[in-house]
Amino acid sequence: MKKIILLFSTLFLMLSPAISNAAGFALGVTVSDNTLDTAGKEDVDSNGSIDAKKNVSDDFNVGSIFAEFTNMGDRFGITVGLEIIPFDADIDKRSITQSELGDENDTASTGTNSVEGTVKDHMTFYIQPGYMVGSNTMLYGTLGFASATVNGKSKSITHTNINKDVDLDGTKVGVGIKHVYDSGLFIKADYAETSYDTISFTTSNSTKATADLDNTSLALSLGKQF
């Protein structure tokens, strides 16, 4: 994925001197409606067998800021940009009651397991090749690399508690439409899917928890060309 983005970035730089009517630098803000799907698994003794599974979805809205640079040819253009979410996004806390069977020396116990998380420092580097369908309107595709930090917290009667930060990387693909006004103001609307790498947490008593996250978003952006 990183090699693909590097290839597009190199192409972008090679085209820069050759295109005389480059659209230029832009700043903007984005509001997006998101659905984050999380598939969680738990391996109590890290032996490769899955002891528990849970799939959940969280719907949320989030704001972000972006900076980008666009080069335009006659009909084709390419944009390179960076989007930053300056806020933390919480994954809703989930709880479930669990009973632990006792042995000949211990009595059975019942308790509540819970898991929650926070996504922070989220940023996306993206490439958007596009095609003009009018004098001021472009259809474009998005290819991006996303990175963030996830703080995972878990409490369980079968393992020691978790409170740990892990790195989260993902690949973003999408499509959108952009309209630029004569004043330099522009609006963008796009749909995107981000598939994140699987992350894992291991407790001190060898319980391994893994989570696979996928995000779907509908976004509306407002920006200004300079």
Model segments located where?
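Cleavable N-terminal export/targeting peptides
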Residues: 1-26
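Gram-negative outer-membrane beta-barrel domains
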Residues: 20-226
